[in-house]
A protein has these predicted regions:
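Active-site-proximal helix/loop segments of hydrolytic enzymes
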Residues: 2-9, 32, 36-193
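Catalytic-core environment of secreted peptidases
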Residues: 7-25, 81
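A broad, low-specificity signal marking well-ordered, structured residues that form hydrophobic/aromatic
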Residues: 10, 93, 146-147, 205, ...
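Pocket-edge structural micro-motifs
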Residues: 14, 97, 151, 219, ...
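Acidic glycine-/aspartate-rich tracts in secreted/extracellular proteins
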Residues: 18, 153-155, 256-257
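Short acidic, gly/pro-rich beta-turn/loop elements at beta-sheet edges
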Residues: 22, 91, 105, 159, ...
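Glycine- and acidic-residue-enriched helix-capping/strand-helix junction motifs
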Residues: 22-36
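Beta-loop motif signature
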Residues: 194-251, 257-270
Length: 270
């Protein structure tokens, strides 16, 4: 019950969509990239931090700016992040808060937290354009603390090379997820439960019932390397336990990986 009380509602907003591709250059479209980053971020926030996460859009559809804010307001989100890719000359990463809010405000402090987490993931590959403020609709019309990120420049060849790499999108997603979790006070779900000593014999990880009705298994020990969905009740033979970004995963006999969080799986002896 205590964990439920601590759960935060996070609304992720992949910019553009449908007839609005956003910026497009170098064989890339902003609307596709930001949706991919948002989905990866959602997975990490849910599986690693136990957050309740929604996307303003999960497919290639157009939603106007006021409706995006309304979705977050009506849900009662605790935090809102709109994800974008920049254009029109330049390079690097930057973030925005509503311009009526000072850097010293609570929203400004949360901006600093999320911004720094993201930039620290990618600083070896790009530059920091700073923590900025602007009168943007999704920042102005949302009732909760809100942030907009601009993740490199789609029309700069060097930035586009990075944005074409799945591993770089993983870094952006990790930065967003870890930064958001830190900003709203979410802890890793594994940190609240001690790992029991591994019993001898063959162990099975059995998927527990959950609100989604499914759980991801992964190709490798990486929360973004999703392979397929499995259903509650499905059981998998455990090979060993590994630690990924501070949280536990089970490596399965099949070579795939699954979360070790007791919220999602239970262990049974074969």
């Amino acid at each position: 019950m205590e964990r439920l009380n601590m759960t935060k509602k996070i609304m992720l907003d992949p910019g553009h969509g449908g007839h609005d591709p956003g910026a497009a250059e170098n064989g890339l479209r902003e609307k596709d990239l930001v949706l991919k980053i948002a989905k990866k971020t959602k997975t990490i926030l849910e599986k690693v931090y136990g957050a309740s996460v929604k996307l303003t859009r999960s497919t290639d559809v157009y939603i106007d700016l006021s409706q995006r804010a309304k979705l977050a307001n009506n849900w009662g989100a605790d935090y809102f992040v709109s994800i974008h890719i920049n254009a029109a000359g330049g390079t690097g990463f930057e973030s925005f808060r509503y311009d009526k809010l000072a850097a010293s405000s609570s929203t400004g402090k949360q901006q600093k937290t999320v911004h720094d987490f993201i930039y620290n993931k990618i600083k070896a590959k790009t530059s920091d354009r700073g923590k900025k403020s602007k009168n943007l609709a999704v920042l102005r019309e949302t009732k909760m603390p809100a942030l907009l990120t601009e993740n490199l420049f789609i029309d700069r060849k060097e930035d586009a090379v990075l944005l074409k790499q799945e591993s770089f999108l993983d870094l952006l997603a990790e930065g967003h997820a870890e930064g958001i979790a830190a900003a709203v006070g979410l802890k890793k779900v594994s940190s609240s439960s001690k790992t029991s000593p591994t019993p001898k014999g063959v162990k099975m990880a059995v998927v527990k019932p959950n609100a989604d009705g499914w759980l991801w298994v992964y190709d490798k020990p990486n929360w973004s390397a999703k392979h397929k969905k499995v259903k509650p009740g499905e059981a998998f033979t455990i090979d060993k336990t590994v630690t990924v970004n501070g949280s536990k995963m089970y490596k399965l006999k099949s070579g795939l990986y699954i979360t070790a969080a007791t919220k999602y799986v239970q262990i049974k002896q074969k």
